[in-house]
Amino acid sequence: MARKKKGEQEHHEDFMKRKLLEGADYATNEPRSAIITRVMCLGIEDADELHKAEKSYGDSWKQRGGVGAFMMAARKWDRIEKQVLGHIYDIFLAMDEDRRPEGILDDIRDLRRYLFLIDAEMCGRGSQDD
């Protein structure tokens, strides 16, 4: 897939498809549903975004230990909960109505990435069965 010229913004779906193709070696030949294919793309995108953030922030997410890591995730959850409260806890409705770049979807992505970091930390410690 051709890359966009400088100044052109790649659509999110195109980015995800490109990332999936780049990461095709990780996939099996078993057919996957559309939602699982999107999950695979998001995993690749999250790893890329976490890599970028690590260059700037290092491992500051766990600087204050497990309690700090938990509180960081809890703050993101609190932000999401506050945003869905006005939509009778309908997260899809809240997302449909809040299309801002810094809106609820951004908080969901941040929380997912924090949880990835926590999971990866625990896997790296060998303290959980994978």
PLM regions and their residue ranges:
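Intrinsically disordered, low-complexity regulatory regions
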Residues: 2-130
